[in-house]
């Protein structure tokens, strides 16, 4: 064989090998008909018992960004918690443990995303974090690019820089996957926690989604201490007593789809906690009424033990929003939450719209797995 022919044959073999590697590397971890069940687990509130067989992914919350722009765990307690979660893979080898960076009031993103060098530094540190703890991917919970609502540093250019940061992370994670022989469903993953409306004004969802394996849509907290009235904080649809400020999970999903996000990349978030409002105007059982005080959050286990059908609280169902709520007429207290019925309906919505699965915040708030069992059963049934 002459040198030219040998070189051409080598080139064809090389191209075939590269193509084969790309197919292996780029194979998505979400197979047809297999839905993700993504649990956020807070390092400061680790459940005593975790059933890994009920989950596909655990998002460990949270790593932080140092003033120097590196991703790290803040202390030894968080490191021990992450190691405990990674050890669950011995029970469920298919479980993926993801390190989530950020969270509410977590600063550092705007600086980390600012320049090519700062993005590379952050991405390299994120990869090092995965290697050190044998974790499987990175999740970014930046609340929020281009907005100072949580009191963090922000810039107008966060909109473009967030996309550039995700592009850098994708490149670094893919390179590390190749180096470590992680292919197909085993490659390092990249996801984000997203919101709706204003979030889309300050991000390039139509461009950034190509770098992501999936998006955890935070379709909750629609009504909170910043809204003037009560309402369903995690309603699937708008309430029967619709007000102009109403937001809902279905609208959030449609925004992502309109931006070009493939349906299988959309993971619908549900809440394992409720939100309370006191001094509520006593009309329509407190739904979408002005209030005097925001009373914060109640985890679902607390609601089940102390509030639902107890202490004067009556459960109501809004069939338009597909959401439950509690009303105490004596204390004029309104509580909005998700329950097994509403979560079961959301699970059917996920399957009907061919979404990528369900996510929830946060595992320790459902101590008896009452809500998780609905998700696990629904996502795995035909």
Regions found by a protein language model. Name each.
Residues 1-11:
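N-terminal secretory signal peptides that target proteins for export/translocation
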Residues 16-25:
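Bacterial N-terminal signal peptides
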Residues 27-31:
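Sec/Tat signal peptide C-region and signal peptidase I cleavage site
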Residues 32-130, 147, 157-160, 166-168, ...:
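Glycan-recognition patch characteristic of GH18 chitinases/ENGases
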Residues 38, 67-80, 145-305:
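Substrate-binding surface in catalytic domains of secreted glycosidases
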Residues 58, 99, 140, 215, ...:
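Conserved, mostly hydrophobic/aromatic
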Residues 84, 101, 223-234, 270-349, ...:
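Glycan-binding loop/region signatures in secreted carbohydrate-active enzymes
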Residues 364-382:
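Aromatic-rich peripheral "rim/lid" segments of glycoside hydrolase catalytic domains that contact
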